[in-house]
Regions:
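Extended, low-polarity transmembrane helix blocks
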Residues: 1-49, 66-78, 82, 89-154
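Perimembrane loop-to-helix junctions flanking transmembrane segments
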Residues: 55-67
Length: 154
């Protein structure tokens, strides 16, 4: 096989491969949204179920700078309950991803002692959230549906 022919064949195979990856993007973005939303929503529900313990944890364990423990508990819990719903719907998806990224970052910063495995989980979640914020939540979203109708996207 000559060099130009080899280059053409390689380029054609690469184009097919990237076409498959492009076709998988909507499903991958949705899977990331559903996974992240579940993690944070369940965390918010746990905080809501035992509010006194949540406030105690924010008083003793989670040292959120500049906020009272009550305010930090309320804001963190509200973010963990509202933003995942937006993320699942893909409504204001980038805003929701950025908001959860901040919640995730504050959780890491606020913990005085975090186990390496827990830190690794937070880095993974942060990476997924950063990807959704940077690249968008994908075409299987209300943001995409609204944009196709000429309305502002999230």
């Amino acid at each position: 096989m000559t060099t130009p022919r080899l280059l053409q064949t390689t380029t054609a195979l690469w184009a097919r491969f990237t076409g498959v990856l492009d076709a998988l993007q909507p499903a991958a973005a949705l899977a990331a949204r559903l996974y992240i939303a579940q993690v944070f929503f369940l965390s918010g529900l746990t905080k809501l179920r035992d509010w006194d313990t949540t406030v105690a944890l924010f008083t003793d364990e989670y040292k959120v700078p500049l906020l009272s423990p009550e305010a930090a508990a309320f804001m963190g819990t509200a973010g963990e309950l509202v933003l995942p719903v937006l993320l699942v719907l893909g409504l204001a998806g980038r805003f929701a991803a950025l908001g959860l990224f901040v919640v995730n970052a504050v959780a890491v910063i606020a913990l005085s002692d975090i186990a390496p495995a827990a830190l690794q989980q937070h880095v993974f979640w942060g990476s997924l959230l950063a990807g959704l914020a940077i690249f968008g939540v994908g075409p299987w979203s209300l943001d995409h549906w609204l944009a196709r109708r000429g309305l502002p996207r999230g």
